[in-house]
Curated annotation (Swiss-Prot):
A single cellular component GO annotation: extracellular space
Protein name: Complement C1q tumor necrosis factor-related protein 7
Signal sequence annotation: 1-16
Keyword check for Secreted: yes
Domain (C1q) ranges: 143-279
Length: 289
């Protein structure tokens, strides 16, 4: 393509060249012959800056750039306006019990409620002061009768020393306060009691005593004379409930107690004379209640 243009330019320019073999005269007018263009020269130095052109039209917005790095935390701003109340959320899990709050103000007095059920009995109170003497009471001396009496014998001879003698033959036992298995009388009612014994002896001396809670109250000694004899004793004792009374041999080898049910008996007896009046009063008060 470039060669074709070059040949065409050359033909055009050749037709316009002046003829050199023609003589120059007075009426000479030159005819130019177009030359062939040379190779491009080197670029010239940059020209001076022109004056700024008018502002162009605003271009279209560019695409959003990538997010920058997170900046440092700024200072706390001022509180904004309170927003509207949002919808009620779901119930959360039950939290730990908080500390007891301060006592609130006393509320208005409520209406009187109904009478509640009777509560359990309270503890026994302290003893009050003694009151004034009351009116004379009604005699109930014959309404309460407490009985305690016994009479027992023995069917064996020569018992062991310093042990309760077992009187195993029961003749009378009001209230069952004498125990024929142990030989002991056990007090049931506080009061004054009368005790007695009549012991037949033979072949040995006899040293016998009446014992109250481990202490001798009376002692009786009877010597063997070669014949049957009887040793006796009696006394009055104040007893408390659970006190014990029995007979025993108090000296070694002097246990001449003799028993022959078909011929002679050895007896141990006792009975209540009267009950302690304070005890009777307490029983009377319980009956009234």
């Amino acid at each position: 393509m470039f060669v074709l243009l070059y040949v065409t330019s050359f033909a055009i320019c050749a037709s316009g060249q002046p003829r050199g073999n023609q003589l120059k005269g007075e009426n000479y007018s030159p005819r130019y012959i177009c030359s062939i263009p040379g190779l491009p020269g080197p670029p010239g130095p940059p020209g001076a800056n022109g004056s700024p052109g008018p502002h162009g039209r605003i271009g279209l917005p560019g695409r959003d750039g990538r997010d920058g790095r997170k900046g440092e935390k700024g200072e706390k701003g001022t509180a904004g306006l309170r927003g509207k109340t949002g919808p009620l959320g779901l119930a959360g899990e039950k939290g730990d019990q908080g500390e007891t709050g301060k006592k609130g103000p006393i509320g208005p007095e409520g209406e009187k409620g109904e009478v509640g059920p009777i509560g359990p009995p309270g503890p026994k109170g302290d003893r009050g002061e003694q009151g004034d003497p009351g009116l004379p009471g009604v005699c109930r001396c014959g309404s309460i009768v407490l009985k305690s009496a016994f009479s027992v014998g023995i069917t064996t001879s020569y018992p062991e020393e310093r042990l309760p003698i077992i009187f195993n033959k029961v003749l009378f036992n009001e209230g069952e306060h004498y125990n024929p298995a142990t030989g002991k009388f056990i007090c049931a009612f506080p009061g004054i009691y009368y005790f007695s014994y009549d012991i037949t002896l033979a072949n040995k001396h006899l040293a016998i005593g009446l014992v109250h809670n481990g202490q001798y109250r009376i002692k009786t000694f009877d010597a063997n004379t070669g014949n049957h004899d009887v040793a006796s004793g009696s006394t009055v004792i104040y007893l408390q409930p659970e006190d014990e009374v029995w007979l025993e041999i108090f000296f070694t080898d002097q246990n001449g107690l003799f028993s022959d049910p078909g011929w002679a008996d050895s007896l141990f007896s006792g009975f209540l004379l009267y009950v302690d009046t304070d005890y009777l009063d307490s029983i009377s008060e319980d009956d009234e209640l």
